[in-house]
Design a protein with these regions (language model features):
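Metal-coordinating catalytic core of metallo-dependent amide/deamination hydrolases
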Residues: 157-278
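Extracytoplasmic/periplasmic beta-strand context in beta-sandwich domains
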Residues: 45-47, 72, 226
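N-terminal-biased segments
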Residues: 80-99, 103-127, 203-207, 250-270
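Alpha-helical scaffold segments that flank or form the walls of functional sites
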Residues: 98-172, 206-221
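Divalent metal-coordination and catalytic microenvironments
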Residues: 31, 48, 53, 78, ...
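A generic structural signal for short coil/turn motifs at secondary-structure boundaries
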Residues: 36-38, 151-154, 236-240
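N-terminal metal-binding scaffold of metallo-dependent hydrolase/deaminase domains
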Residues: 1-67
Length: 278
């Protein structure tokens, strides 16, 4: 008589009785439900039950001899459903410039120049909305983005604008900054409403700006989470081992202190270096 919904692995298990009066806010039925769990469980046909903003239960349609009451029922016959799927890596900014440097080997450097010198808050807000719309188009309602190609660390407004632009479309968005990649120093321009002001960007500015963003934007909106998102953790080329260790430890400290995810790139040897030194 008991139905076990979703997976204990993700803490979303919900048991309920077939004979009880059930009421869900949303019930998706007859879809091909791909759970994205470690067992690669697929229910076809299957259902997904939602209460408020939480997946309450999933399973095969055979577990529902009579449809429970629901505020809304959607028949997804012929469609795939991936409950809980997260687009776990993106770069805020790329949606608006992704075709500009398509055939250039130096596209990453050019993207950094655009992000640091040719953008304002409206750029980041508009890009956040466009990226969110594209994610929704492909059935994804939670996204994670690093703000910039390598994070822009001289100001925090791009983070807030990207979160706002994404959340107003209706998705749950996690965006952030952290230690940026070289070369150093970088040149940045910021729009103050009347003109651009120029500044020189140094690596340790990321410590201050990352923490300021965490303080400013977490708790502002239920669909927005500001995270720690350094461009790379491990052993960055062009920096000493001591500097890398300091960067890595500070990013870890901020994520732990503010209780947010730590999201980054890591390449050959980075994981071992982090394990040995952080």
């Amino acid at each position: 008589k008991k139905l076990a919904g979703f997976s204990e692995e993700y803490g979303l298990l919900a048991d309920f009785d077939k004979e009880a009066d059930l009421m869900f806010d949303l019930l998706l039925i007859n879809g091909c439900v791909i759970t994205v769990d470690s067992a690669h469980t697929v229910y076809q046909p299957g259902y997904v039950a939602v209460e408020k903003d939480t997946i309450a239960a999933i399973g095969p349609m055979s577990d529902l001899p009579v449809l429970p009451e629901a505020g809304r029922v959607i028949d997804l016959c012929g469609h795939a459903v991936l409950p809980g799927l997260v687009d776990a890596h993106g770069h805020a900014g790329h949606c608006l410039i992704k075709n500009l440097f398509e055939y250039r080997d130096d596209w990453d450097d050019l993207a950094e120049q655009v992000y640091y010198q040719c953008t304002d808050t409206e750029f980041w807000r508009a890009e956040g909305s466009l990226a969110a719309a594209e994610r929704i188009k492909f059935g994804i309602t939670t996204g994670v983005s690093m703000v910039g190609s390598t994070p822009r660390i001289d100001i925090i407004e791009p983070v807030g604008a990207n979160l706002e632009g994404s959340s107003r479309v209706g998705i749950r968005q996690l965006s952030g900054i952290g230690c940026a990649n070289g070369p150093w120093p970088k040149k940045a321009r910021a729009w103050n409403g009347k003109e651009y002001t120029e500044s020189t960007v140094t690596p340790k500015m990321a410590y201050r700006s990352t923490e300021e963003a965490l303080k400013a934007y977490n708790g502002r909106h239920p669909l927005e989470t500001c995270i720690v998102a350094p461009g790379r953790m491990g052993l960055r080329p062009g920096e000493s081992a001591e500097d890398n260790i300091a960067h890595n430890r500070e990013m870890y400290r901020l994520a732990e202190e503010y209780g947010v995810p730590l999201h980054t790139h890591a390449f050959a040897g980075d994981i071992q270096f982090l394990y040995d030194t952080t």
